[in-house]
Amino acid sequence: MSLKSILVVGAGGAVGLEIVRALCARGADVTATYRTPRNGAAAAIAAAGGRAVRLDLADRDAAQMAIEQAGGVIFTPILTVSAPAAALLRPGQAAVFFSSNNVAVDPQAEVYAALLAAEKRVAAAAPQAAILRPTMIYGYPGDGNLSRLNAAMRRWPATPLPGDGRGLQQPVYFRDLARAAVDVLFDAGRHGAICAVAGPQAVSARDLYEAAAIAAGAPKRFVPIPVKTAAAALGALERAGMRLPVKAAQLRRSLDDKTPRGEVILTETLLAEGLSALAAAMDGGALDAQPAAS
C-alpha cells in the first residue's frame, strides 16, 4: 500500500493537528484519531484537513482495523502508550513513534527506563518503524513547558532559576516537530532509525529564561534556588501526597545537559521566534500565525 493514505493516532492535540496539516499539504488522505471526546476535537481535525475518527489504542480490534487500512502511521501518544500497537503493523509498513530525548539524558529514571523498554519493544515488533526523541516541546498554550514559564513570569515579579542557570536545553518548536515526523515517515532512509529532534540552537537555562521573559514582556529578574535542597523539599511534599506543578525529579534534571544525543534532526524555528509566537497565542492571538523561520 502506498503512503497516500496515512493514519495519525492521537491527533486531538496541538502536535497531532500540525501533523495532519503537514500531511494534507503533501496531498495525503489523512485519517486522524482522537481518544478523549473533548469539545471541538473532531471539528479541529476536519478543519486541518483530516477525517476524524474516535479511537482508543486499548481497543485492539479497532486499532488493528484502522492500521490495516493505512499506508503509513504516525503515533503521537508517548511510546509507553503506543508501543503495543507496533505489533499490529504490517511487515514493512512505515510508522513513526514518539519517545523522549531524556531517554539518553537520564536513562536510570523510572519514566525514561520505561520509555527505553518501549523503544526496544517497538524495534522488535516493527523494525521498520522510526522512533523520534524530541527535546523539550514548546510553542502552544498548555505545552506543559514554556507556556507554564510564560504564565508564571507574567504573574510574579521574579522567577526562580534552578541552580546556576548553566544547564543546557535545545527546545523544539511544536510545528517543526510535526513537520519532522512527516518528513521521516516519507523518508525510507530513516525508517528503523532512532532520531533526536531538536531546535537549531542550544541555550543555557539562564538564556532560555531571559528569552522567555522578553517574549512575555516580563521583568528579567531571576532568583537562583539550590536544586538539591529544593528537590528534597519537593520530594517530601510528593511523598505526603501533594500534587505539585514541578516534580523533584524534574528539578534535579534541570542541571543536566539536555542537548540531543545520537542521530539528530535539527529544525528551523529560532527560540526567540517560537517564544514570540507562543506569547501571542497565550494573549489570544491565532495559533495559525507562523514564526518567520518556520
Predicted features by range, described:
Residues V53-A70:
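Conserved Rossmann-fold cofactor-binding substructure of NAD(P)-dependent oxidoreductases
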Residues G12, T36-R38, Q201:
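Residues in the short beta-alpha loop(s) of Rossmann-like NAD(P)-binding domains
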Residues T135-G142, G163-F174, G199-Q201:
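Glycine-rich "substrate-gating" loop/helix at the edge of Rossmann-like oxidoreductase active sites
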Residues P37, G72-V73, A83-A125, A129-A130, ...:
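Conserved Rossmann-fold NAD(P)-dependent oxidoreductase catalytic core, especially the SDR/UDP-sugar
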Residues A151-V172, V184, A188-H191, A196:
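A conserved pocket-lining segment of Rossmann-fold NAD(P)-dependent short-chain dehydrogenase/reductase
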Residues T33-N39, L57:
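N-terminal Rossmann-fold cofactor-binding loop
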Residues D187-L244, T269-S294:
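Mid/C-terminal beta-alpha module of Rossmann-like enzyme folds, strongest
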Residues I6-A25:
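N-terminal Rossmann NAD(P)H-binding glycine-rich loop of SDR-like oxidoreductase domains
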